[in-house]
Curated annotation (Swiss-Prot):
Similarity-based family: Belongs to the anthranilate phosphoribosyltransferase family.
Top-level taxon of the source organism: Bacteria
Name the record gives this protein: Anthranilate phosphoribosyltransferase
MF (Gene Ontology): anthranilate phosphoribosyltransferase activity; magnesium ion binding
Assembly: Homodimer.
Binding site for Mg(2+) 1: S99, E232
Binding site for anthranilate 1: G87, N118
This protein's GO CC annotations: cytosol
Pfam family, any one: Glycos_transf_3
Keywords assigned: Amino-acid biosynthesis, Aromatic amino acid biosynthesis, Glycosyltransferase, Magnesium, Metal-binding, Transferase, Tryptophan biosynthesis
Binding site for 5-phospho-alpha-D-ribose 1-diphosphate: 87, 90-91, 95, 97-100, 115-123, 127
Length: 353
């Protein structure tokens, strides 16, 4: 494409043409800099969604979003082994904060976690909401987050703090009220750029697209979608998994029952308001057994599996991860991780304001 303008990009999308990475990066740059108007943002998002986003197009959006992000500069060796445990949200299931709890379990097992998230979108309690309720300050800057990762084994990048340019798209997204490409960017745009991730996606078409972006940049990731629609490794149905590693993507259908996890129902995993979900975190860390623990264990196991080879048969890696995850809770390591994290975060908070 020659000179990039909104009419040119929109016309191409309406024809059904695939945009190149530079095209979508340009569009995202215009949006995040505040140069795009509401009609241009809405037209682009809807036209791209109607055509169907491709890995190439999504990669351009991700590239521009990271360019405009406030970076978290982790040491190279830490970034190479750190993992994000995150979901796109949007599954409308209103579960407890499974990925948040799994993050604490993974960190308790000795793997550094850099979590990227926001307040609730489709549910009543997002990652940021429950962490804030538990005592974690959300206004930490990049240096403070890096300190948390180094000293507590876990840090949280509050999306609103690290992607300020996304405020220009917020009103349009709310008015549209339907999922667009913006709904799938969060897990791909962690400002700390960890090289591994266990990533939930509610959309069956977009999950392999996200996996292809992870693969293209050399990350090790498991993209997860429950057959019940959960953006997690579900225990209420089989889970479709896209394993991205070494530049390739492999798809598999797994069932938590094959790992010895009892079948649950979505009602077993239902959450509530922020106080309810925070109490669920405390009960899990105190050793309470049941469906919530089971769901947390299998999602933590998926994150731990990304630290090694993602072979065609993931069962062995997941079973090993389940043992490590259970020990993280039962030894008290996960609970101590939360306590240490809050302590470090409160200590470094003044430097981040």
């Amino acid at each position: 494409m020659g000179e990039r303008t909104w009419p040119h990009l929109l016309a191409a999308l309406l024809r059904g043409d695939e945009l190149c990475t530079a095209d979508t990066a340009w569009a995202m740059g215009e949006i995040m800099s505040g140069s795009a108007g509401p009609a241009q943002i809405a037209g682009f998002a809807v036209a791209l969604r109607a055509k169907g986003e491709t890995p190439t197009e999504l990669a351009g959006l991700v590239e521009a979003m990271l360019t405009h992000a406030v970076p978290v500069n982790l040491p190279a060796e830490l970034r190479a082994t750190a993992v994000d445990v995150v979901g796109t949200g949007g599954d409308l299931a209103h579960t407890v904060n499974i990925s948040t709890m799994a993050s604490l379990v993974v960190a308790g097992a000795g793997v550094r976690v850099v979590k990227h998230g926001n307040r609730a979108a489709s549910s009543s309690c997002g990652t940021a909401d429950v962490l804030e309720f538990l005592g974690l300050p959300l206004d930490l800057g990049p240096e403070a987050v890096a300190t948390c990762v180094a000293e507590a084994g876990i840090g949280f990048c509050f999306a609103a703090r690290f992607h300020p340019g996304m405020r220009h798209a917020g009103p349009v997204r709310r008015e549209l009220g339907v999922p667009t490409a913006f709904n799938f960017l969060g897990p791909l745009t962690n400002p700390a750029r960890p090289r591994a991730g266990a990533v939930g996606c509610f959309d069956a078409r977009m999950a392999p697209v996200m996996a292809a972006v992870f693969a293209a940049r050399g990350d090790s990731a498991l993209v997860l979608r429950g057959e019940d629609g959960l953006d997690e490794f579900t225990t209420a149905a089989p889970t479709r998994v896209w394993a991205a590693q070494d530049g390739t993507v492999r798809e598999a259908l797994l069932d938590a029952t094959d790992l010895g996890i009892p079948r649950a129902t979505l009602a077993d995993l239902r959450g509530g308001d922020v106080a309810y979900n925070a109490e669920a975190v405390r009960r899990l860390l105190a050793g309470e057994t049941g469906p919530v623990r089971d769901a947390v264990l299998v999602n933590a196991a998926a994150a731990l599996a990304t630290q090694g080879p993602l072979d065609a048969d993931l069962t062995e890696a997941l079973q090993a991860g389940l043992l490590r995850a259970a020990d993280s809770i039962d030894s008290g390591a996960a609970a101590r991780t939360l306590e240490r994290w809050i302590d470090v975060a409160q200590t470094v908070r003044p430097a981040a304001v």
